[in-house]
Amino acid sequence: MKIGIQVFVTDETLTPNEIAVLVEDYGFESLWFPDHTHLPSQTSTRHPAGYAQLPREYARNLDVFVALTAAALATRHLKVGSGVCLLPQRDPILTAKMVASVDYLSGGRLLFGVGAGWNLEEMQNHGVDPAERFGLLRDRIRAMKAIWAEDVASYDGRYTSFDKIMSWPKPVQRPWPTVLLGANGPRAIQSALAVEADWLPGRHKDHAGLVARVREFRERSDGRLGVTLSDPYLDPGQLSALADAGAERAFFLIPASSRDEMELHMGKIRKAVDGIASP
């Protein structure tokens, strides 16, 4: 199993390039940055993890594509990933250009994780109807794939339409970078399969259920699509079982306020995954 690190990179942490060099030096396969454009000062939406108050880094994180570019240009082999880009809140033509640009500048090292979002007020501030976000997500993935794959692209969907547009650079990864759909709900597997995306499940309390779902996804995709685990429990036995079921990667969320703090957490992860991690 490939092992990565996830960090909320903000104006109060190490810079993305400093973080990336450290993560690569420790031998991790990938580095992931979340995506929030802002934090509403008043929100009735509860965090999926049940926080009583949303962490301050949600309002302070750097733009995900700027951070990924800095991380990629500071390293040689480290894969860089969005974990996850809130695609319903972004223009698909502009985002396709940004994704392709990062993949081009990184030499094909981008992993494009996407999600529908969970903070209702945040998406409403972008003019997104929360009830439409899952349809928007699927529509925009398909539209962006057309832009990446075709020299002259057209798309006519429910939420996105354009006719005969040209956009370069094209991604180094052809026909497009790896797209991973972040979702945990009962329709998560079907949603990922519908847009030909890898599955990116978050932490599950039901370990046996997650193992079964990973195996189901791999079987239903005939092994063509992968599974990456977002911040699973750091339990060697559970990770080994998930790897056996077909999960190819896991990344773990750690703080990054200082080099010492990062090294402490990365050392613990390295020790826990010894014997599970693959190059």
Q: Residues of each region from the PLM?
A:
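Active-site-adjacent structural elements that line small-molecule/cofactor binding pockets in enzymes
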Residues: 1-279
